[in-house]
Amino acid sequence: MNAGDTAFILLCAAFVFIMTPGLAFFYGGMVRRKNVGNTMMQCVFIMGVSVIMWVLVGYALSFGGNHAGIIGGAKWFGFNGVEMKPGPYADTIPNLAFAAFQMMFAMITPALITGSVAGRMKFKALVLFIILWSLIVYYPMAHMVWGEGGFLAEIGSVDFAGGNVVHITSGVSGLVLALTLGKRRGYDQGVYHVHNTPFVFLGAALLWFGWYGFNAGSALAANGLAAHAFMTTSVSAAAALVSWMLIEVFSEGKTTLVGASTGLVIGLVAITPGAGFVPMWAAVICGLLVSPICYFGVKLIKGKLKIDDALDAFGCHGIGGIWGGIATGLFGMTSINGVAKWNGLVFGETRLFVAQIIGILVYIAVAVVGSLICIAIVRIFTPLRVEERAEKVGLDVSEHGENAYPSFNGLD
C-alpha cells in the first residue's frame, strides 16, 4: 500500500461528498420558493439512505464478484470481508478506501434524478423509487463498467469517472419520471423563474470543487493520470462556461449567472467519461460543443416536445453524458490510459467508438426499463404525484410542514 495514494483517495472521496450538498443548493435555487425545502430535502435524504444501502448491499452488488457480467455477488454484504488491505481494484490503497470513494458516486447519482420531478412528486414515493432504482439500475450499471468481469468493460466500453454510469442513467431516468408524472400544474400558462440565483451559483461552485475529486480520484492514485484528469476537468468546464455565455449573448442579448453556472456544470458532465482518456485539446472541444448541444436540446425538450423536465436533469446530465461518451470514442488515446484498448475515431480506429455507442445504448435501455419497473412497484404502495392542493400550497408545507422562508405566505 501507499500512504500518499490512500490519503489522496480519501480526500477525493470527501470532495465527491460535497457534490451532493452542492447539488441541493443548485437545484434548490432553481425552484419556486414554496418548493425549495422539499427540493433540498430530496438530496439530504439520499445522503443518508445511500450510505446505508452501500454498506449493506450496494458495494457487494457493484464490485463483489461477478455474475454474468451484469451484477456482483454477496461476498461483501454488510462490508463483510472489506478490509484495510488492498482489494482487487487498486493495488496501493485499502479496499475500504476504494469502497468509500465509490460510495460517494452511489450518493450523487440518484440525487441528480430529483431535478426532473421538482414541485410535484410525493416525498415517500421518491424515497421508495430511489431505493429501488439504486438496486435495479445503478448497482448493475456500476458493475457492468467498473466491476470485475463487467459486460461493458469486456467489450471495451470505457467510462473514466462516471459520465455514463452516473449522468446518462440518472438523466434518462429523470426523463422517464417526468413523462410519467406529467407537467407541473399551470406549466403551459406560467413562466417559471429561478428564485435564488446566488444559491444556484453556490451549488455550481461546490459541484466544480467536488468534481476534481470525482475525476482526478478516479485514477485511484496520486499520479500523472490524476493530474491529467484534473486539468481536462478544468479545461472542459471553462470552455463550456464561456461557450454557454456566447450562446446567451447571440440568442438573448445578455449573459446570466444561471446560464454560466449551468454551462460549467455541463462542461464537467461532458468530460467525466473521458477525463482520463482524451488529450487536453480534445477537452476544449468537448466543453465548447456540449453547451450548444445541451442548450438546444433543452429548447427541444421543453419548447417543442413540451416535456416538463423541471430542472433539466435530462437536458444537462443525460444529453451531456451522451455527448461525453461519444467524445471519448472520438478522442480517446491508449497512450494516455491503457484501460482504453483502442484509440478514438479521429485517430483512425473504429472499435473504441463502436464500443462507446453500444455502451450508451445499454445505459439508456437499462435506465428506461429499470425506471419503469421501479415506478410500477412504487405505484403499488403510493401514488407518485401529490394532490392538486398540495402542489398549489407548495411541497415545503404539504410534505414537510416547514417553510424555507417563514415570512413568505404566497403561492409562488
Stretch-by-stretch model annotation:
Residues 1-412:
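Glycine- and aromatic-enriched membrane alpha-helices
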